[in-house]
């Protein structure tokens, strides 16, 4: 076995061990491990459920702490095993063992890279589930079709990431596509991964709805906001709400159009409107809509505070609601993020949910 190959594997494993050590420091492993022990003791107390809110908060904290402690503990253990296997391969000169060592190094590189990537989630709401609102812009059928393409793109992205995606509300376009849709995304760091997708998405293509084959430009807006749990107080005055019920539209069988199960809530001071029609129960739709409203109001307040802070830091990039963030030019096979300049030529893959390069760059650059 050539020395160069051995040196490369050893160098890779030692580098990974150093990076894992740095991650333990960055992620405050020792303090989190100690806190996890405390939380477990509190949850073992039979009286903990006398205060259900506190018990639920402890349960959420435990899950987040375990996400760091368990991950880093397993990583350290696997790195030690990989180094031991490498030493065995070097001593015995066994090709199969060396190949296994190379495979271990590649897998560990991916794991360390993933943990380093997760360090970029600095927003307090990053670990939360989230909602995605998609709204077709001006442009009639073409814009509605583009909105439906974006909806499919995000559903496929969620599928790739192992997130659960549930369409809570969807309004069909007059001819094709959708006018708007709301998706609830459930999964670890769902908001963290998706929050930089907020903005205007621009599509340029030869329209299938234009018999002359003309080139059309369409816009759709995407707004991502976190689901807020009960540990965060958001005051909503019932007098500020207008609650309407209506018959759900779309797929759902014979029952869906027989009762006014869909719920629309308007928050009159802000003009925010949320809708939910995915459940046959009006009660459950109303509860989901209230959760959406609470999350929207929280996000609006956070963005207001961020805007005030950004005024003091003029060098920061504007990533507001009306900001165009990505251009999809299909006839030139080019999708470009206008904030990070990341560009991909495989437009089909992007529209099939391959957004990792764009999202990774936007998080790394803090856009």
UniProtKB/Swiss-Prot annotation:
Q: Which InterPro entries match?
A: PCRF, Pep_chain_release_fac_I, Pep_chain_release_fac_I_sf, PrfB
Its post-translational modification remark reads: Methylated by PrmC. Methylation increases the termination efficiency of RF2.
Pfam family membership, one: RF-1
SMART domains in UniProt:
PCRF (SM00937)
Domain of life, per UniProt, equals: Bacteria
What are the entry keywords?
A: Cytoplasm, Methylation, Protein biosynthesis
**SUPFAM superfamilies for the chain:** Release factor
State a GO cellular component annotated for this protein. cytoplasm
Q: Does this entry carry the keyword Cytoplasm?
A: yes
Tell me the compartments it is located in: Cytoplasm
The residues forming a coiled coil are none
* GO MF, one example: translation release factor activity, codon specific
Tell me which residues bear N5-methylglutamine: 254
Described function: Peptide chain release factor 2 directs the termination of translation in response to the peptide chain termination codons UGA and UAA.
User: Can you tell me which family this protein belongs to?
Assistant: Belongs to the prokaryotic/mitochondrial release factor family.
Q: Any idea what this protein is called?
A: Peptide chain release factor 2
This chain's source organism reads Burkholderia cenocepacia (strain ATCC BAA-245 / DSM 16553 / LMG 16656 / NCTC 13227 / J2315 / CF5610) (Burkholderia cepacia (strain J2315))
Encoding gene, per UniProt annotation = prfB
């Amino acid at each position: 076995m050539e020395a160069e190959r051995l040196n490369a594997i050893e160098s890779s494993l030692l580098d990974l061990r150093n990076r894992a050590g740095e991650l333990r420091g960055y992620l405050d492993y020792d303090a989190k491990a100690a806190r996890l022990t405390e939380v477990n003791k509190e949850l073992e107390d039979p009286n903990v459920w006398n205060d259900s809110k506190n018990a639920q908060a402890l349960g959420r904290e435990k899950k987040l702490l375990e996400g760091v402690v368990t991950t880093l503990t397993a990583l350290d253990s696997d790195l030690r095993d990989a180094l031991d296997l490498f030493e065995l391969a070097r001593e015995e000169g066994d090709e199969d063992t060396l190949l296994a060592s190379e495979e271990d190094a590649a897998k560990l590189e991916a794991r360390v890279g993933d943990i380093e990537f997760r360090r970029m989630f600095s927003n307090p709401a990053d670990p939360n589930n989230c909602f995605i609102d998609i709204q077709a812009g001006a442009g009639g059928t073409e814009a509605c079709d583009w909105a439906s393409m974006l909806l499919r793109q995000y559903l496929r992205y969620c599928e790739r990431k192992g997130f659960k995606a549930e369409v809570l509300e969807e309004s069909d376009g007059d001819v094709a596509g959708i006018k708007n849709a709301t998706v609830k995304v459930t999964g670890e760091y769902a908001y963290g991964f998706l929050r930089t997708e907020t903005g205007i998405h621009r599509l340029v293509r030869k329209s299938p709805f234009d018999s002359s084959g003309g080139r059309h430009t369409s816009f759709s807006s995407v707004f991502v906001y976190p689901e807020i749990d009960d540990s965060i107080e958001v005051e909503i005055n019932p007098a500020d709400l207008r609650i309407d019920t209506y018959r759900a539209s779309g797929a759902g069988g014979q029952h869906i159009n027989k009762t006014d199960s869909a719920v629309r809530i308007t928050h009159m001071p802000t003009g925010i409107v949320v809708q939910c029609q995915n459940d046959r129960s009006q009660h459950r739709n109303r509860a989901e809509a209230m959760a959406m409203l609470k999350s929207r109001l929280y996000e609006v307040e956070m963005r207001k505070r961020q805007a005030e802070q950004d005024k003091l830091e003029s060098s920061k990039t504007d990533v507001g609601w009306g900001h165009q963030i990505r251009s999809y030019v299909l006839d030139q096979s080019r999708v470009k993020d206008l904030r990070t300049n990341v560009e991909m030529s495989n437009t089909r893959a992007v529209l099939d949910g391959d957004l990792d390069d764009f999202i990774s760059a936007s998080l790394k650059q803090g856009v």
